[in-house]
Regions:
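Soluble metallo-hydrolase cores and metallopeptidase-like ectodomains found primarily
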Residues: 1-30, 53
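Acidic/histidine-rich catalytic neighborhood of metal-dependent amide-processing enzymes
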Residues: 28-111
Length: 111
């Protein structure tokens, strides 16, 4: 187990509402996930395959999250609108897979 680590995160969920779609009639329909959550997960699965072949000296933790894009839609008028975003990340931050976990976090977006 390497003490030097990086953590790579991706989420597989998508928005249940296309509330930012230019066409207002789509605002209450779900977003298809192939190029949202699924693309990041696919990229991390390929990284995992390559890491397994190369066996780097650096420890690489791949963490897949859910409920990241569940945030309240634009048309929501209730309280606590921000609390519904990044639920998987919030949970993981409070309950890491290893007590005292410490890694360099790598941020990258796939659009």
């Amino acid at each position: 187990e390497s003490k030097k680590r990086i953590a790579l995160f991706a989420h597989w969920d998508t928005r249940p509402w296309a509330d930012n779609d230019p066409d207002e009639k789509n605002h209450k329909t779900p977003i298809l996930g192939a190029n949202d959550g699924a693309s990041g997960v696919g990229a991390l699965l390929e990284i995992a395959r390559l890491v397994n072949q190369q066996q780097p000296e650096l420890g690489i933790d791949i963490i897949l999250l859910d409920a990241e894009d569940y945030g309240a839609p634009q048309f929501y008028t209730g309280k606590h609108k921000e609390e519904f975003w990044c639920l998987g990340s919030q949970y993981w931050a409070r309950n890491p897979h290893v007590q005292g976990y410490n890694a360099r976090l790598v941020s990258c977006s796939i659009w």
